[in-house]
Amino acid sequence: KKVLSFSHSLNTYEGTGVPEKIYNEEKNNGKFRLLGLYGNNSTNWLITDCACMISGVTTLVMHSKFSIDIIIDILNNTKLEWLCLDLDLVEGLLCRKNELPYLKKLIILDNLTKRSEMKIENEEKSNGSRKSSNKQKYNESDKREDISLCALECDKEKIEKINSLKEKAKTLGLSIIVFDNMTENKIANVTVQNEDPNFIASIVYTSGTSGKPKGVMLSNRNLYNGVIPPCDCNIIKKYPLTTHLSYLPVSHIYERVIFFIALFLGVKINIWSRDIKFLNTDICNSKAEIILGVPKVFNRMYATIMTKINNLSRCKKWIAKQAINLRKGKNNGNFSKVVEGITNISRKIKDKINPNMDVILNGGGKLSPEVAEGLSVLLNVKYYQGYGLTESTGPIFLQDVDDCNTESMGVAVSPSTRYKVRTWEIYKATDTIPKGELLIKSDSMFSGYFLEKESTEHAFTNDGYFKTGDIVQINDNGSLTFLDRSKGLVKLSQGEYIETEMINNLYSQIPFVNFCVAYGDDSMDGPLGIISVDKHKLFTFLKNDNMLKTTGVDEKNFSEKLIDETLNDPIYVDYVKGKMMEIYKKTNLNRYNVINDIYLTSKPWDTTNYLTPTLKIRRFNVFKDFSFFIDEVKKKYEEKLSGSSTGSMNNGKSGSKSDIKGGSKDDIKSGSKDDIKSGSKADIKSGSKDDIKSGSKDHIK
């Protein structure tokens, strides 16, 4: 009802509704009625999205974590007049209204309607709708209801704040509208407008890992082919969805498409509490059978579980690790079930994470095979991976339900998808197993970048394939294995190539490491690393390893002590590099993947500096701000070439005792570029090659 009512208001509010404007854009014949969407996950956000599709209004979606400067640029470039946004984002725009000549209306997405139900502890409700027979204290799930109760108490404050903002907005020539006021009309029927398959229904501004965001235009055809084919995938057939927890940013195409899929399949949608402190509780209480996430979420989940196991008593820890290793050795098969039946370890862990979970589905980036396999065993769940882009309208490749290869990104979801690779650097499209930059053509592939004709033309090949910039190999069964991003492959001075994305994932497995950003070029013998650490977790590790006396750190001063200026003293650098070497020794990677030079930072990394709203790293920003360290390390290699030699660099300090030299036979395996691979034939099942096109003179296969 609210969707229909809001749709009606978009066409009739104040007599005209959302205005139509003419743009220098070929799509929609240059005519667009734009409604901005700028907020966090909420019911009203989703209602707005659906209402726009009915009314023929094009949504212009922006991440809520975009900086205010980026938002202002987008609003001015698109000459946007109507904007839906969260209440806590309004004041930032009002303060910059003098820079926003086109903006006229702000629609507050916050729900101000009071709920009738109240949590009553240890009492029975007379209407029988809810009974409490548990006389003990309420559990974690009850806390979420307390949060709702607190939110209700804040309603008056919100209303007062809105009234205050309305007065301020009025003086600036803006009008503020409460969402509920636009959904009061009772509308029985609405005629769906602009059903043309080529009509641009949404423009999504991508976060990007460098450069300014671009508006990805998605047509009705794109959205249909991004949503309907995945509904028929065999993962969902084998593990039917009944509940979905919406916690990934809905402004990101990944979560948004999943929402549409859930809507189409009649799946219950729970929206998380929007409080990061309660995310684990939200996941546990969601009862979702399939937990979708990105590498950052699953890396943290894995690190948390392993930390708790390592903190068990010596006997319990030994039993747990032996059971886990036994199950890993048997590939989590029938023998694994016997071991789990005896130890019940996975059930105990799973009960704390989400007892209903059957599947973990990773997207938005490659998860390291070790973490993927580890979570699969620890939680006794199936792990699958997909691949997609904003430009592809979300997931375009997805693993088959019987594909157990943790390196695989799966096969094409839609029958309209065609793909191939073209030779890039050392990756040859003409190899027996073709490798190179992934090129895609599909009905789900976007219709261009809004108002950026040149960027659109540059994004496609002459024969209409989108250039993803991702390096993959095409396996015998048509599935893809992700190798690296084209910008992430670096050639060192020896001519050896390293995969910085893989290195970043490798060392990010250390529980106290938030992010690892590797850098290298052809003037360097090995990569360096910018390491973001968590103060609290690092302190816990120092404490457990009896390092407090040596470092002079204690529970009272660690927050002040573990800052960038002191973290790069040799004692901390040695310690962290030791942990990195422990991780490295568990791999078969060659010595060029060892990081000798590291800079440790405990400063916050968020969307205002180094992270995109989907928690991908903006490498360009990191390299720029830490260029002082990069320059110091590069200078070391220059001096080495000129005949003088220095130790590894850490904020200008000479190398520490544990500098990792060019490799002992015991610790470092010899290697060449052939050692860096992401899969083997043994992992790949036979299949068709129908989607792999024949080569051309450009070595495109």
Curated annotation (Swiss-Prot):
InterPro entries, sorted: AMP-binding_CS (IPR020845), AMP-dep_synth/lig_dom (IPR000873), ANL_N_sf (IPR042099)
Listed GO MF terms: long-chain fatty acid-CoA ligase activity
Glycan-bearing residues: 40-41, 76, 111, 127, 139, 181, 189, 311, 334, 344, 477, 557
Stretches the record annotates as Disordered: 120-140, 641-701
Per-repeat ranges for Sequence: 653-660, 661-668, 669-676, 677-684, 685-692, 693-700
Listed Low complexity bias regions: 642-655
Record keywords, A-Z: Glycoprotein, Repeat
Region (6 X 8 AA approximate tandem repeats): 653-700
Record has Transferase as a keyword: no
Bias-annotated ranges (Basic and acidic residues): 656-701
GO cellular component: endoplasmic reticulum; membrane; symbiont-containing vacuole
Matches recorded under Gene3D superfamilies: 3.40.50.980, N-terminal domain of ligase-like (3.40.50.12780)
Keyword Phosphoprotein found: no
Cellular localisation: Parasitophorous vacuole
Superkingdom of origin organism: Eukaryota
One Pfam match: AMP-binding
Similarity comment text for this entry: Belongs to the ATP-dependent AMP-binding enzyme family.
UniProt-listed PANTHER family: LONG CHAIN ACYL-COA SYNTHETASE 4 (PTHR43272:SF3), LONG-CHAIN-FATTY-ACID--COA LIGASE (PTHR43272)
Entry protein name: Octapeptide-repeat antigen
Protein's organism: Plasmodium falciparum (isolate NF7 / Ghana)
